[in-house]
Each structure stands twice: as structure tokens, then as C-alpha cells.
């Protein structure tokens, strides 16, 4: 099972960080998961190095229960490998 970490930056912003396979569908699947919940990221950063895609997504204004649920769902995306 893969894992995603949700790091609180402050009381209203959550940062999700994960490593994934360098596949064209990984980032769109992560963003689609947010869009289906009506969430718009404040910041998205992705960098491919060799065979790993490092992704950081920040979202503002999430309740803690929602933040935890989104993190679990991101970890279930095919191609997501691990927390960094």
C-alpha cells in the first residue's frame, strides 16, 4: 500500500507530499480527485527525476476530517509509491 503525508502548514492550509511513478496519468488523477470534491489547490509542484515523480499539493481551508480523507484517497492512486 502506498502512503501520502498531509503536513499542516498552518491552521487553514494542508500540504500533501508524495512520490509516484513517472507516468502521464498520475498528476491528472491526483488533481481530478480534488476537483471532484470541489477543491482547487493553492499550489501544485511536480518534478520528475529519473524514474520518480515528486509531487506537492497545497490546499487551503480544509477541515481535518476532509484533509485526512483526501490524503488516504491520494495514497490509493495507481502509481503513487511513497511519502518523502
Describe the residue ranges of each PLM region.
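A conserved regulatory-domain signal marking ACT and ACT-like small-molecule sensing domains
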Residues: 1-84
